[in-house]
């Protein structure tokens, strides 16, 4: 193996005692190794250093400071006007320790201590303002204080002063400023008495790190036995790691803390990111691991090499690790390098590697999660333009490299970066031109809340396993019950993975109520209107009811339930003694968002039950997954109109709110936070007016005081991220936040509806559309007829027009950088069993779209339609993707 050369750059600026310096000098002079040639230079001039670097091919440099001392005086030293780290970095010379930018930041001790938030109280006074300073609160709390002169030029103070009072400070400051014109400022720092000075040394590069602590005694000796409370020690170590990760320190750092015995407080007093020769580091390693100075050189070289990827360094790494304690090697060397070093491994090696990927017992490696996220973010697919419809380009070729599960553990950062490429081609819901579906822009807070929740993995099946999450769930239920108008003491609720599961709970509650209250062998039915969600038949089937037992009530021309036919269906069922398990009313959808009048519906039910002397009451479920945020307008003063909402928009809000404010009449309600609630999928909440309807879902025998979610939920494996996401949304957005959001999106929808006819679009039933959607229809350019005429012209006319609309939607999104993604809905109206008429839906959801930029969206659609019509007239058979037969409403 070829011998390598290492250069130490040493400075006499370091405050070590004379005996220790002699020890270091002796070591350098007598260092002898078959593989490493150790050179050192003390306080070089820049020319001297650069000449040495040019003449020698050093494997790496070990700088032990930022500056070289030019002259030393009693009270100050004069340094050369160059930064050692900057010089090395500018010439691309490899060195151990952190980079130049961090060196600059952490050379300004007052600044970074203040930034830390846990430093002793401090204040800077300047030559020009100190006489005008008053005895403010900060100054009062500082005494007794240490005073450190701060020079403007290339000087560093060697002395500190002490001030015991304000008058003492003024006198000392005057003396300092008079005695030396180069001193511009004085840093005043509260003196901590009865203290223990502790250094936490972290060595390595994440996640391959180890740490130890040393105490520098007042007599200059080092002790590794730290006599402070364990909670303080844990806090100190965790804080050190937090800074190590936060500032991405490289190779090592020493964090100096002071523990005040009297106040039991911990203070950060200094950070060393370059000098590996400090006594607390060398002596600490000697006492803890019985390492000599030569082994310490091996240690830092090992750290340096392990962070490199060149396989040519493996022989050198093998040489070094053989001479180091095994426990240090285990912590510092990656599994991949161990594999290259030893060509064999056992289960302990694997477990040691995997252990680095979970929290330590003291949780000092929490910030490893932040590092992984931060690095992965840098490798996400590229956002090509602000208006790009998709993230990156659709490309999943990386999956070809993972056809089989790897044999041994792989680098998690690499795998994360690979996996993030699966987002290529992902729709960007937050882009104003994304008008496809009811997917909101997700707020940051629920994502953060979900992340730290997942880190601790609470299981919300029981309060034993999930800290306070079930209490948080109960608080959300209580808040929303009050909003609905229920007695929060009697209501209950449970978070579910989606609105379909909420429907399942509602229908199951109805089936259970039927069994308890109605003696019949006839299979019960579920009644709902044609506007209700398409999944209800599937839910019935999954719960043991035939699909035909979902009875759909026809609609009125306004698109809501026909209450006359609804009443006739109830009468017919009661006449035939067919039990009704559940009646579902719609609380809005993704088309016209017509909400059904639950007040009228329950009055009809109540009267019919009385008339037919029915002794049980079917479970009434209000499917409010879309329009629940309109409840925040229940107490809005429409006359004052505090939020200055346009009247046409306000009228629609008022209509919906006045209809759904009777939701308290429902027995159960479903809410989706992932629709108009800013939360990631999936996040739904099923609520019941009376807790027994939920608690008797599966097991009626459980003692109420001992009841846990697993007694009444459909599944035992239950996370808690939906709970904390919803809680964060509710508490951070607030009533007026939801009001503002609804007003904004309805204003955009109103603009769309008002302006689209100018571009030969027909807006369908705008007067009976109350949500964010705008339903559009347009005629084939050669025909110039309206939707009614198209229907009257028969199936072929409808088919051709449907095809035209589909091609138009494809044309609008053809330019993925500037296009518009709208929704093609082929099954809007069923004309016959073999023919349905299609429409285009504009569904704005993001707050990045507002009244102003909505005009640009309309103009772009109009412009593109004009272009497309010209092309279509030339060639009606334009080539696009296959036209879908069905799109979920």
What are the residue ranges of the model-derived segments?
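Conserved PLP-binding catalytic core of the aspartate aminotransferase-like
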Residues: 763-816, 836, 843-844, 850
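N-terminal entrance/gating region of PLP-dependent enzymes' catalytic architecture
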Residues: 321-489, 811-828, 833-852, 856-861, ...
